[in-house]
């Protein structure tokens, strides 16, 4: 398969939209009509719950598949429901890709040695099964990883990405309020921890730079810290950057585009709750109106990001 960075860059350009929609389902987000339909299909509550999640996700995907280039399911919201939840995740990935969307699995995995190899093969590559063949188990186009175990925890993901045309996004400067507890600490050489991680990501991604000029070894840099995002981009000129923190976490479009390159490329901004629950911000709308509201919000987000790129506040 082609280089992941090239595929994502082309998809963003084709839709003129640097947005990835997060798929982090909760039962409270799902319309009653969907839950009732799922309950009518299955007697097993666990199975009907997973079916409701899948129906909801399909509705969200149908609403925006011609607008956004990618979706980002957060694994925890499916693991929460055990085996049935993981089946819903698998079906969500397959459905999104059937609609022409790239899938970034937000799993934040990492370990060392054989465990890292197993994660990499299971999430991004192929796994050998009993008949001797190798098959793709998860099928995601990319996965988020935690690079704070160092190179030996990342190397298996890089190798699989090189072989399979998949990609990774390493945590560099996260969007959560307490991120600075560790990531802003200063090292003996004067760099902050997140800066050192950015330098490592730049090093790890050198062999996976595609024709687009971007590497399939990307980074996660939150929109909630725009000044650090500008600094991170300087240290990672070739990295694709996944930008959480827009919308429900408080960051606006100006901060969200801080990590983009000078020509407005190289980053993709995530929105989860603000898209999934867009009906909440529209007067007179209910959960039953989620598809139309999500589509409206996705178009509005696209236009705001593009306007912010045309008039940069953080450079």
Specify the residue positions occupied by each region the protein language model found.
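A C-terminal functional module that forms or caps the active site or interfaces directly
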Residues: 54, 219, 223-270, 274-278
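N-terminal glycine-rich anion-binding loop in soluble enzyme alpha/beta folds
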Residues: 2-65, 285
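N-terminal active-site wall of soluble small-molecule enzyme domains
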Residues: 67-69, 73-132, 136, 225-228
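Short, well-ordered coil/turn segments that N-cap beta-strands
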Residues: 15-19, 66-69, 99-101, 138-141, ...
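Acidic (Asp/Glu)-rich catalytic clusters
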Residues: 61-68, 95-98, 158-163, 233-236, ...
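C-terminal helical cap(s) of enzyme catalytic domains, especially alpha/beta-barrels
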Residues: 256-262, 277-315
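Conserved, mostly hydrophobic/aromatic
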Residues: 21, 71, 106, 143, ...
